Amino acid sequence: MQERSIKRIILVCSVLCLLAAAAFANNNTKEENIDRGIRFTETNPPVAPVRPIAEFEPASAVLIRYPLGIPLSLVVQLANTANVICIVSSSQQNSAISAFTNAGVNMDKVSFINTITDSYWTRDYGPWFIFDGNGEYGVVDFVYNRPRPNDNLVPQIFANQLNLNYYGMNLQQTGGNYMCDGVNTAAQTNLVYSENGNNQTNVNTKMNQYLGITNYCVVADPNNTYIDHIDCWAKFLAPDKILIRSVPISHPQYNAIETTATYFANQNCAWGYPYRVYRVNTPNNEPYTNSLILNKKVFVPIVGSSNDNPALQVYRTAMPGYEVIGISQASSTPWESTDALHCRTHEIPDKNMLHIVHTPWHSIISAGTDIVFNVEITAHSGQPLYTD
């Protein structure tokens, strides 16, 4: 009797789930139903040599999702820094417009992409960006490492709506576990290997083909948390600068974090000399490395701790010329040690940027010595360059 009752309950639940799914599908717009028909397919890689675009490069926009995972006050600041592209379902767009308008967001800087999403973690499922060997801007997609099918479609929908070159890289990945230097280097935890069958050769090859990564720093996660995302403990601030969290010697992850910091201090950056490693104190697992660099501003999550101001000062010391802004959490979506501001936003690089490449002088020279700098300038806007 008990077994039969259980079977009946399961049957009723199954029917209710099917009805709910049908009702949800019927609320989709025609455009959103078309979006659901897109499926991931690996494409040919971009024309080599490929250059990955770093977070600290010029950005035209920032990608967020509504309902929000960030405070409305941050949306106001983002719209004063770049364009804001908001992913929202058609049924919720008016709600988003009302919330943004009431908060004082500059709506001239806001545009919408209508599609259904499963979560607000645009960092994790959003597109990655490259310039190919012909200087053409493009989106690199991947298989999102979470069972969120709507989120997994966002890079394709984004590329389609903005008419961008699209490349599908058949690796299971997540944006919170990826950072690059804008030259040839990427850093990730070894989650990338374990989620791709521990086939390191395959992962390394695809990262090179699709993103131009020739210097690949893959390390164990020193935080030893469930998520294994690198943005929970480190951040590239420039091609030769990396920020890594620090903790007291009594902290259970002290040894692992110090070992990782030493590893990066002994690695050469793309410019041929060791990384300058900056440390930010996180004794209570504060998410200070989980920040967003957007043009010349750095938005840092703060938690009302006495460690907030010293953390902001670390950024100011490491990044002269940037405005460093502390952002308090929304009570409904608080910052967490494994999920904060960086996880819920995603910069969109400027496809028309002026890209200037030169290797900084790093050694001591005598006074009066002439120095020759070789500089390569690319106007991705297609506009001519003028000599001075």
Where are these regions (language model features)?
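Glycan-association/targeting regions that enable binding to alpha-glucans and other polysaccharides
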Residues: 349-388
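Enriched but not universal
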Residues: 1-4, 24-30
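Bacterial N-terminal signal peptides that target proteins for export
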Residues: 2-13
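The feature marks the mature, well-folded catalytic cores of soluble enzymes
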Residues: 26-355
